[in-house]
Amino acid sequence: MTKLSIIVPVYNVEKYIRPCIESIFKQGLDDADFEVIIVNDGTPDRSMEMIADIIQQHSNITVINQENQGVSIARNNGIQNARGNYILFIDSDDLLIDNTLPYLLDKAISSKADIIVADFAEKDDNGITTFLQQSFHQKNGNIEEVKGTYLLSQPLFHGFSCVWRHLYKKDFLIRNNLSFTPHIYFEDTAFTYQCYAKADQCLIVNWIFIIYRVGHQSIMNSNFTKKKAIDNCVIINKIWELSEDKGIESNIRLKIRDDAFSFFSLLIYLVVSCDGIKRSEKMEVLQYLKHLVPDLSFKNGLKQKTVSFLYRRMPSVFLTLRIFYANYLQRNIWAIKGKMKNINNTTN
């Protein structure tokens, strides 16, 4: 019986893909217990050539070739072809820490949890690895069983929505029709929120098992574009839709709405402060956000009404004023969460 399917999308990672695949086979797992699904997303470089010998050596590796359609469709194809009880998504430039996966897999199988949440380390471009605990608050030691909505109730933190820090029960994903939104950036965020909202049983495990390579993929760098801004709008909308799901406890829905406001504030800061987006494109993003996301306006008090009016009726003026405000937000970006929570309490 295949216990675990490890899905690895591959695109333009010839520098990193071999160490990634090698790390999977340094886990001390029997080949019969897991499979590796490598999804070649039409990569134009030598990525597949770099791992050709590893593929030949292991009968539990399956290669799926597709035209370049993005990581979301690559992962979705992996899900549909997976035979394991549990699924792990790995980015092709990341690494598993030697002999750490069996412990997590054992906890998953024995608990039958929908989702296992674990910790990770980070490796920068200089090769320096930082081991840090970035996880949810645990009341009872190193392992805790909770509902998915408990995870949604927790404060946002670095790595909150990264799919590669989770094991997912395949039956849970299929039964709830959970998949990645195609052709957008930041697909992890919406997927994680939707999974947490549906999960009856999650296991938080204080266990570092994967090394995330940081530096070249950050949205805070110069590669932030109009396309990424629009995709952020889509993600915010999906999160907002969850806040209107009456099947979720009211206090959790307020927290989800609070998160949407936080992402909204961060997006506005990124748009107005990014040199790579033309002013005309910034205006397009503001207009798109205004019509896509439900009521994000401020309703109470003269100051709030003024901000709402400028944003909705005079976006050009709003954008100009917002640029002056950007430096303040850079120092205090998450402080706005408290203000938004007060607005939520007033309007609900």
Language model features with spans:
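Cell-envelope/extracellular polymer assembly enzymes that use nucleotide-activated donors
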Residues: 2-5, 35, 190
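Short, well-formed alpha-helical segments that are part of the catalytic scaffolds
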Residues: 13-27, 50
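A conserved acidic beta->alpha catalytic loop
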Residues: 23, 40-50, 67
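Short beta-strand/loop segment that forms part of the nucleotide-sugar
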Residues: 32-42, 62-67, 92
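Glycine-rich, basic loop-to-helix element that forms the pyrophosphate-binding segment
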Residues: 66-82, 92, 103
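Donor-binding/catalytic cores of nucleotide-activated saccharide
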Residues: 71, 92-205, 212-226
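Short aromatic/hydrophobic "clamp" motif used to bind/position activated sugar donors
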Residues: 87
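Membrane-interface aromatic/basic loop that binds lipid-linked glycans or pyrophosphate carriers
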Residues: 273-348
